[in-house]
Amino acid sequence: MQFIAQFRDPSTAENSDYERHLKRLWPVIATLAAKDDRLADWFLQGSNEEEARLYPVYDAPSEPSTAAKAVLREQYRGEDKLAKTIGMWNGRIEKKEGASISLGFDTGAIPCDFELTVGEENATSSRLGDFESVAEVVATIATTYAPAYITAAPRKYASKQVFDDKPGVGWMLYLPKPITSQHVPEAHALVPVATDGKQIGTIIISAIDVPFSINNPEHVETANRIEIRLVDQDLLPRYTDI
Protein backbone atom coordinates (compact mmCIF):
# COMPACT_ATOMS: atom_id res chain seq x y z
CA MET A 1 0.00 0.00 0.00
CA GLN A 2 1.25 3.45 -0.89
CA PHE A 3 0.33 6.75 0.76
CA ILE A 4 1.19 9.95 -1.12
CA ALA A 5 0.68 13.55 -0.01
CA GLN A 6 1.78 16.95 -1.27
CA PHE A 7 1.95 20.00 0.96
CA ARG A 8 3.57 23.41 1.24
CA ASP A 9 5.79 24.64 4.04
CA PRO A 10 5.46 28.22 5.28
CA SER A 11 7.64 30.72 3.42
CA THR A 12 9.31 31.48 6.76
CA ALA A 13 10.53 27.87 7.21
CA GLU A 14 14.31 27.58 7.38
CA ASN A 15 16.09 25.40 4.85
CA SER A 16 18.12 22.37 5.94
CA ASP A 17 16.22 22.10 9.23
CA TYR A 18 16.43 18.32 9.47
CA GLU A 19 15.50 18.18 13.13
CA ARG A 20 12.25 20.05 12.52
CA HIS A 21 11.24 17.75 9.68
CA LEU A 22 12.00 14.59 11.65
CA LYS A 23 10.21 15.84 14.76
CA ARG A 24 7.24 16.79 12.62
CA LEU A 25 7.14 13.29 11.13
CA TRP A 26 7.03 11.57 14.53
CA PRO A 27 3.21 11.46 14.98
CA VAL A 28 3.00 9.50 11.72
CA ILE A 29 5.68 7.08 12.95
CA ALA A 30 3.88 6.65 16.28
CA THR A 31 0.57 5.92 14.54
CA LEU A 32 2.21 3.34 12.28
CA ALA A 33 3.96 1.66 15.21
CA ALA A 34 0.64 1.33 17.03
CA LYS A 35 -0.72 -0.61 14.03
CA ASP A 36 2.30 -2.87 13.46
CA ASP A 37 5.38 -3.07 15.69
CA ARG A 38 7.49 -3.76 12.59
CA LEU A 39 6.92 -0.09 11.77
CA ALA A 40 8.36 1.22 15.03
CA ASP A 41 12.06 1.43 14.14
CA TRP A 42 13.40 3.37 11.15
CA PHE A 43 16.83 3.81 9.61
CA LEU A 44 18.27 6.21 7.04
CA GLN A 45 18.52 4.52 3.67
CA GLY A 46 22.00 3.63 2.44
CA SER A 47 23.75 2.30 -0.65
CA ASN A 48 23.75 -1.26 0.74
CA GLU A 49 22.08 -3.25 3.52
CA GLU A 50 24.94 -2.86 5.98
CA GLU A 51 25.11 0.90 5.51
CA ALA A 52 21.32 1.18 5.69
CA ARG A 53 21.32 -0.21 9.24
CA LEU A 54 23.96 2.13 10.62
CA TYR A 55 21.88 5.20 11.36
CA PRO A 56 18.61 4.97 13.31
CA VAL A 57 16.41 7.95 12.55
CA TYR A 58 15.30 8.38 16.18
CA ASP A 59 17.08 7.92 19.51
CA ALA A 60 13.83 8.21 21.47
CA PRO A 61 10.21 9.14 20.78
CA SER A 62 10.14 12.40 18.79
CA GLU A 63 13.92 12.77 19.23
CA PRO A 64 15.88 12.58 15.95
CA SER A 65 19.18 10.81 16.41
CA THR A 66 22.41 12.79 16.48
CA ALA A 67 23.86 10.40 13.91
CA ALA A 68 20.99 10.85 11.45
CA LYS A 69 21.19 14.63 11.65
CA ALA A 70 24.94 14.52 11.10
CA VAL A 71 24.58 12.27 8.05
CA LEU A 72 21.96 14.55 6.51
CA ARG A 73 24.01 17.69 7.15
CA GLU A 74 27.00 16.08 5.45
CA GLN A 75 24.93 14.69 2.56
CA TYR A 76 23.55 18.13 1.73
CA ARG A 77 26.57 20.24 2.68
CA GLY A 78 26.68 23.36 0.50
CA GLU A 79 23.17 22.70 -0.87
CA ASP A 80 21.16 24.83 1.51
CA LYS A 81 18.95 26.32 -1.21
CA LEU A 82 18.40 23.07 -3.12
CA ALA A 83 15.60 20.53 -2.73
CA LYS A 84 16.30 17.67 -0.32
CA THR A 85 14.92 14.22 0.39
CA ILE A 86 15.09 12.14 3.55
CA GLY A 87 14.72 8.46 2.73
CA MET A 88 14.22 5.87 5.45
CA TRP A 89 13.20 2.22 5.82
CA ASN A 90 12.12 -0.08 8.62
CA GLY A 91 15.08 -2.46 8.38
CA ARG A 92 13.01 -5.42 7.15
CA ILE A 93 14.33 -7.22 4.07
CA GLU A 94 11.28 -9.30 3.19
CA LYS A 95 8.98 -7.33 0.91
CA LYS A 96 5.87 -8.27 2.90
CA GLU A 97 7.46 -6.90 6.08
CA GLY A 98 9.24 -3.92 4.57
CA ALA A 99 8.27 -0.26 4.52
CA SER A 100 9.84 3.00 3.39
CA ILE A 101 9.25 6.71 3.81
CA SER A 102 10.42 9.48 1.50
CA LEU A 103 10.10 13.10 2.62
CA GLY A 104 10.92 15.85 0.13
CA PHE A 105 11.32 19.46 1.29
CA ASP A 106 13.14 22.75 0.62
CA THR A 107 11.45 22.55 -2.77
CA GLY A 108 10.98 26.25 -3.43
CA ALA A 109 8.08 27.00 -5.77
CA ILE A 110 6.89 23.40 -6.05
CA PRO A 111 5.12 21.41 -3.31
CA CYS A 112 6.90 19.30 -0.72
CA ASP A 113 6.00 15.62 -0.81
CA PHE A 114 5.49 12.71 1.54
CA GLU A 115 5.42 9.08 0.43
CA LEU A 116 4.92 5.99 2.60
CA THR A 117 5.07 2.50 1.12
CA VAL A 118 4.07 -0.50 3.24
CA GLY A 119 4.57 -4.05 1.99
CA GLU A 120 1.58 -6.34 2.44
CA GLU A 121 1.50 -10.05 3.22
CA ASN A 122 -1.38 -10.69 0.82
CA ALA A 123 -4.06 -8.93 -1.22
CA THR A 124 -6.92 -9.70 1.15
CA SER A 125 -5.68 -8.03 4.34
CA SER A 126 -3.65 -5.04 5.45
CA ARG A 127 -0.89 -4.88 8.05
CA LEU A 128 -2.40 -1.60 9.14
CA GLY A 129 -5.80 -3.10 9.93
CA ASP A 130 -9.29 -2.49 8.61
CA PHE A 131 -10.45 0.59 6.71
CA GLU A 132 -11.03 2.55 9.92
CA SER A 133 -7.50 1.79 11.10
CA VAL A 134 -5.96 2.78 7.76
CA ALA A 135 -8.04 5.96 7.80
CA GLU A 136 -6.40 6.82 11.13
CA VAL A 137 -3.02 6.76 9.37
CA VAL A 138 -4.38 9.04 6.65
CA ALA A 139 -5.85 11.37 9.27
CA THR A 140 -2.51 11.60 11.09
CA ILE A 141 -0.74 12.53 7.85
CA ALA A 142 -3.45 15.15 7.26
CA THR A 143 -3.15 16.78 10.68
CA THR A 144 0.65 16.65 10.51
CA TYR A 145 1.20 18.20 7.08
CA ALA A 146 -2.07 19.96 6.11
CA PRO A 147 -1.62 18.62 2.57
CA ALA A 148 -3.52 19.45 -0.61
CA TYR A 149 -4.45 15.77 -0.82
CA ILE A 150 -3.51 12.31 0.42
CA THR A 151 -3.99 9.13 -1.59
CA ALA A 152 -3.90 5.60 -0.18
CA ALA A 153 -3.83 2.89 -2.83
CA PRO A 154 -1.80 0.03 -4.24
CA ARG A 155 1.06 1.45 -6.32
CA LYS A 156 -0.33 -0.14 -9.49
CA TYR A 157 -3.61 1.73 -9.16
CA ALA A 158 -1.95 4.69 -10.91
CA SER A 159 -2.50 2.93 -14.24
CA LYS A 160 -6.20 2.43 -13.43
CA GLN A 161 -7.21 5.92 -12.31
CA VAL A 162 -9.22 8.12 -14.66
CA PHE A 163 -7.15 11.31 -14.72
CA ASP A 164 -3.39 11.53 -15.14
CA ASP A 165 -3.19 15.17 -14.06
CA LYS A 166 -5.03 14.71 -10.75
CA PRO A 167 -4.79 12.45 -7.70
CA GLY A 168 -6.67 9.17 -7.87
CA VAL A 169 -9.07 7.89 -5.24
CA GLY A 170 -7.78 4.33 -4.91
CA TRP A 171 -8.76 2.99 -1.49
CA MET A 172 -8.87 6.39 0.16
CA LEU A 173 -8.50 10.03 -0.81
CA TYR A 174 -8.17 12.89 1.66
CA LEU A 175 -9.18 16.38 0.56
CA PRO A 176 -8.89 19.47 2.81
CA LYS A 177 -12.56 20.40 2.61
CA PRO A 178 -15.89 19.12 3.90
CA ILE A 179 -17.25 16.38 1.62
CA THR A 180 -20.70 14.86 2.11
CA SER A 181 -22.61 11.96 0.61
CA GLN A 182 -24.41 14.50 -1.55
CA HIS A 183 -21.07 15.28 -3.20
CA VAL A 184 -20.03 11.64 -3.63
CA PRO A 185 -22.91 9.18 -3.23
CA GLU A 186 -20.61 6.44 -4.60
CA ALA A 187 -18.33 6.63 -1.54
CA HIS A 188 -18.68 3.69 0.85
CA ALA A 189 -17.62 5.85 3.81
CA LEU A 190 -16.70 9.45 4.55
CA VAL A 191 -14.50 10.22 7.55
CA PRO A 192 -14.19 13.83 8.73
CA VAL A 193 -10.75 14.94 9.93
CA ALA A 194 -10.59 17.60 12.63
CA THR A 195 -7.97 19.66 14.44
CA ASP A 196 -8.82 21.47 17.68
CA GLY A 197 -12.46 20.55 17.21
CA LYS A 198 -12.67 22.07 13.72
CA GLN A 199 -13.06 19.97 10.59
CA ILE A 200 -10.13 20.47 8.22
CA GLY A 201 -10.98 17.85 5.61
CA THR A 202 -12.57 14.55 4.67
CA ILE A 203 -11.32 11.05 3.86
CA ILE A 204 -13.29 9.52 0.98
CA ILE A 205 -13.26 5.72 1.15
CA SER A 206 -14.13 3.46 -1.77
CA ALA A 207 -14.12 0.04 -0.03
CA ILE A 208 -14.91 -0.93 3.56
CA ASP A 209 -15.44 -4.69 3.69
CA VAL A 210 -11.95 -5.70 2.50
CA PRO A 211 -8.78 -3.84 1.52
CA PHE A 212 -8.88 -2.21 -1.91
CA SER A 213 -7.53 -4.41 -4.70
CA ILE A 214 -6.78 -3.47 -8.31
CA ASN A 215 -7.74 -7.05 -9.17
CA ASN A 216 -11.29 -6.41 -8.01
CA PRO A 217 -13.21 -4.73 -10.88
CA GLU A 218 -15.85 -3.40 -8.49
CA HIS A 219 -13.21 -1.65 -6.39
CA VAL A 220 -11.63 0.00 -9.42
CA GLU A 221 -15.01 1.00 -10.86
CA THR A 222 -16.12 2.59 -7.60
CA ALA A 223 -12.89 4.56 -7.27
CA ASN A 224 -13.14 5.72 -10.88
CA ARG A 225 -16.74 6.82 -10.45
CA ILE A 226 -15.79 8.84 -7.38
CA GLU A 227 -12.97 10.53 -9.34
CA ILE A 228 -15.38 11.50 -12.12
CA ARG A 229 -17.94 12.76 -9.61
CA LEU A 230 -15.33 14.93 -7.88
CA VAL A 231 -14.07 16.39 -11.16
CA ASP A 232 -17.62 17.19 -12.27
CA GLN A 233 -17.92 19.35 -9.14
CA ASP A 234 -14.41 20.82 -9.42
CA LEU A 235 -13.41 19.19 -6.13
CA LEU A 236 -10.35 17.25 -7.33
CA PRO A 237 -7.24 19.44 -7.69
CA ARG A 238 -4.86 19.34 -10.62
CA TYR A 239 -1.24 18.69 -9.71
CA THR A 240 -0.25 21.94 -11.43
CA ASP A 241 -2.57 23.93 -9.16
CA ILE A 242 -1.21 22.58 -5.86
Task: Describe these PLM feature segments.
Residues A40-P154:
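Internal, hydrophobic cores of structured domains that mediate oligomerization or house catalytic pockets
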Residues M1-S47, R155-I242:
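C-terminal interaction module
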